[in-house]
A protein has these predicted regions:
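Interfacial loop-to-transmembrane junctions
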Residues: 207-229
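Residues within membrane-spanning alpha-helices of integral membrane proteins
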Residues: 5, 48, 102-105, 109, ...
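Membrane-embedded helical hairpins/re-entrant loop segments and their flanking transmembrane helices
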Residues: 105-163
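Transmembrane helix exit motif
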Residues: 55-64, 86, 94, 98-125, ...
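Loop-to-transmembrane alpha-helix entry segments
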Residues: 69-72, 91-105, 124, 215, ...
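Small-residue-enriched transmembrane helix starts and helix-helix packing motifs
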Residues: 1-18, 122-135
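Small-residue-mediated transmembrane helix hinge/kink sites in multi-pass secondary transporters
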Residues: 32, 85-90, 150, 210-211
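Small-residue-rich hydrophobic segments that form or flank transmembrane alpha-helices
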Residues: 9-73, 135, 145-199
Length: 242
């Protein structure tokens, strides 16, 4: 078990660094990778708690960039619908959720690599729709950051503004779904001991990501990240049929 958690912590740190740099959030990489070493619903529970600390770190590091209007218009529907998505995990079979997660993540990554997401228009309607979809999928499959990222990209925010605005929205989403996951038994008493490690990882990963962001072209790194996501989700999807 300790060996599993050691790998889990390494994956969490890697995903946190990558998530900060790419602006997609760490869950799109972390959830499918962590599901290889731990039960999927346990990953959902731990990820939600981990992300609370992760987003607090990002909000502190990038706090000057928060766009309050976008955060409210995208964040309110996300917070409302994440609860609905999280409750669905009690009724949909786990294997089907995992398969659906990997299919959706693979499709989003492929869509973003194609460049078509740049055609999304800057509008309140897209903010409300993006918030609804990102929140629902964050609750159901553990990640909605890519959809939120696609929506935010239409507004041409600066790096700091993009990350800070995304983080404060994600904060509300994670607090909401964490409550549902804990009530559903996904995060149990035995996992409380992980919290100090998750706090350290979230701070270290966010800080490292911010420093690296100054040296690596964001666009180049995003394509690398998307490639890793494609490969990871494809491998996980194939494992479903083994």
């Amino acid at each position: 078990m300790m060996g599993q958690y050691f790998i889990f912590f390494l994956l969490a740190l890697l995903a946190e660094i990558v998530g900060t740099i790419s602006g997609f959030g760490s869950s799109i990489l972390f959830v499918p990778l962590a599901s290889i070493v731990l039960d999927f619903k346990v990953v959902l529970g731990i990820t939600a708690v981990f992300h609370v600390f992760s987003n607090l770190s990002k909000i502190y590091l990038f706090q000057k960039g928060i766009d309050k209007q976008i955060a409210l218009k995208l964040g309110i529907p996300a917070v409302l619908f994440v609860t609905l998505g999280a409750w669905q995990t009690n009724y949909i079979p786990q294997k089907e959720i995992e398969l659906g997660m990997n299919f959706i993540i693979f499709s989003i990554a492929l869509y973003m690599m194609s460049g078509h997401h740049k055609r999304i228009k800057e509008s309140n309607t897209n903010l409300y729709l993006g918030g609804t979809l990102s929140g629902f999928f964050a609750g159901l499959i553990g990640t909605g950051g890519a959809i939120r990222g696609i929506t935010l990209a239409a507004f041409n925010l600066e790096k700091d503004a993009f990350i800070a605005t995304s983080a404060i929205i994600d904060m509300g989403v994670d607090v909401s779904r964490a409550g549902v996951y804990i009530a559903s038994g996904y995060f149990q008493r035995e996992h409380v001991i992980l919290i100090p490690f998750l706090i350290i990882i979230s701070i270290a990963g966010s800080y490292a990501g911010k420093r690296i962001l100054n040296y690596i072209p964001e666009k180049t790194f995003q394509y690398i990240v998307l490639g890793v996501i494609l490969l990871t989700s494809l491998i996980q999807g194939v494992r479903y049929f083994w």
